[in-house]
From Swiss-Prot:
Name this polypeptide is given: Fibrinogen beta chain
GO cellular component terms, semicolon-separated: collagen-containing extracellular matrix; extracellular space; fibrinogen complex
Record-listed Sulfotyrosine modification sites: Y5
Example GO biological process: blood coagulation, fibrin clot formation
Disulfide bonds: C205-C289, C215-C244, C397-C410
Biological role stated in the UniProt entry: Cleaved by the protease thrombin to yield monomers which, together with fibrinogen alpha (FGA) and fibrinogen gamma (FGG), polymerize to form an insoluble fibrin matrix. Fibrin has a major function in hemostasis as one of the primary components of blood clots.
Record keywords: Blood coagulation, Calcium, Coiled coil, Disulfide bond, Glycoprotein, Hemostasis, Metal-binding, Secreted, Sulfation
Assembly and interaction partners: Heterohexamer; disulfide linked. Contains 2 sets of 3 non-identical chains (alpha, beta and gamma). The 2 heterotrimers are in head to head conformation with the N-termini in a small central domain.
Organism encoding this protein: Gallus gallus
Biased amino acid composition, Acidic residues: 1-12
Length: 463
């Protein structure tokens, strides 16, 4: 018999028989058969007796189908399957197995793709988890810092509520009580002034007989008491009343401006500043007017006095603690109305700071230059001559700063500003949110209003 090969498996197939023929091309020569061992035993046993045929009958033995051929007799069981039978069986199985294998391969490929996708997704989730954990850690740190800060704020607020606010309330109550007393005092003063104005204007105190061109001339004529006098700078003008300070620096000072209690409103028009306004003096319990009132002498009168000869001006101020400073200008001239009462000052001495010539010492450069008063024209709310050049009519120094003055853009000094009790004030207290108090910035800054301020002039005599 010849050897056949299966095209599918490429393995030899041998025709099965009771013996296995030798394939000399692929197998070596068989070895010699060994000698059979001797038969063991001592002899035959006697024949057993016959048994009952019925007893000898056996039931059929059922063998499971092992996939091969059966013996003719069922008792002999299943023959060993031949190669052909195995091949046929395998071919039958192959038709079923191959689609299953292909399906399994497809499933394995899909599973592989799915596994790759899942791996990438897991990696992405892992990275996000790492980032989330880091972010959470950072958030925990920020939250901890925020909680710490909030606790500090809470403690600060609690401390203020427990300690500072009650103290501030006590201070405010004291301030309110003080203001109430001052209001009552002003109401009484207004009532007194109203009663006084109901009667014809007559001198309520004696006026000295001595008079002169100005207070220095009166001093030289023997008038050495500080009180109200009558002066006449030249024969062509009507005599008028002034207060003469005969004590400060050898006396002879003509008081041209005075602020001391807020009893007079200095937010006046051009013509009022031209003529003058306020109360020259009043009696302090004596028989003469020994106490100056609040007033502005008048631009025409001031201009005329400075034209008599070289004139100096002394500006004195006092804060609400009683501290005093002054600014002395050895040269002081006010030009006439045709020149808009232009201001000229020179030769500063004093400890208040040279606000009129140098501007506000807190400012620098152009901002400081804007606050210099020397050389400026006089301005009132109805006559804008300041250095604030703008097309907006609301932007006017005199309107915003409370009085008439030689404003630039706008001031370092504001003697004719609003009167604020207590000194310190703020933008929300001001009518226009500006520093409109009685200010001398070089001493107390913008937001401190003086208790007292005055301007006095006298002839200047070089040493």
């Amino acid at each position: 018999a010849s050897v056949e090969y299966d095209n599918e498996e490429d393995s030899p197939q041998i025709d099965a028989r009771a013996h296995r023929p030798l394939d000399k091309r692929q197998e070596a020569a068989p070895t010699l058969r060994p000698v059979a061992p001797p038969i063991s035993g001592t002899g035959y046993q006697p024949r057993p007796p016959k048994q009952d045929k019925q007893a000898m009958k056996k039931g059929p033995i059922i063998y499971p189908d092992a996939g091969g051929c059966k013996h003719p007799l069922d008792e002999l069981g299943v023959l060993c399957p031949t190669g052909c039978e195995l091949q046929t069986t395998l071919l039958k199985q192959e038709k079923t197995v191959k689609p299953v294998l292909r399906d399994l391969k497809d499933r394995v490929a899909k599973f592989s793709d799915t596994s790759t996708t899942m791996y990438q997704y897991v990696n992405m989730i892992d990275n996000k988890l790492v980032k989330t954990q880091k972010q959470r850690k950072d958030n925990d740190i920020i939250l901890s810092e925020y909680n710490t800060e909030m606790e500090l704020h809470y403690n600060y607020i609690k401390d203020n509520l427990d300690n500072n606010i009650p103290s501030s309330l006590r201070v405010l109550r004291a301030v309110i009580d003080s203001l109430h007393k001052k209001i009552q005092k002003l109401e009484n003063a207004i009532a007194t002034q109203t009663d006084y104005c109901r009667s014809p204007c007559v001198a309520s105190c004696n006026i000295p007989v001595v008079s002169g061109r100005e207070c220095e001339d009166i001093y030289r004529k023997g008038g050495e008491t500080s009180e109200m006098y009558i002066i006449q700078p030249d024969p062509f003008t009507t005599p008028y009343r002034v207060y003469c300070d005969m004590e400060t620096d050898n006396g002879g000072w003509t008081l041209i401006q005075n602020r001391q209690d807020g009893s007079v409103n200095f937010g006046r028009a051009w013509d009022e500043y031209k003529r003058g306004f306020g109360n020259i003096a009043k009696s302090g319990g004596k028989k003469y007017c020994d106490t100056p009132g609040e007033y502005w002498l008048g631009n025409d009168k001031i201009s005329q006095l400075t034209k008599i000869g070289p004139t100096k001006v002394l500006i004195e101020m006092e804060d609400w603690n009683g501290d005093k400073v002054s600014a002395l200008y050895g040269g002081f001239t006010i030009h006439n109305e045709g020149n808009k009462y232009q201001l000229s000052v020179s030769n500063y001495k004093g400890n208040a700071g040279n606000a009129l010539m140098e501007g506000a010492s807190q400012l620098y450069g152009e901002n400081r230059t804007m606050t210099i008063h020397n050389g400026m024209y006089f301005s009132t709310y109805d006559r804008d001559n300041d250095g604030w050049l703008t097309t907006d009519p609301r932007k006017q120094c005199s309107k915003e700063d409370g009085g008439g003055w030689w404003y630039n853009r706008c001031h370092a000094a504001n003697p004719n500003g609003r009167y604020y009790w207590g000194g310190t004030y703020s933008w929300d207290m001001a009518k226009h949110g500006t520093d409109d108090g009685i200010v001398w910035m070089n001493w107390k800054g913008s937001w401190y209003s003086m208790k007292k301020m005055s301007m006095k002039i006298k002839p200047y005599f070089p040493d």
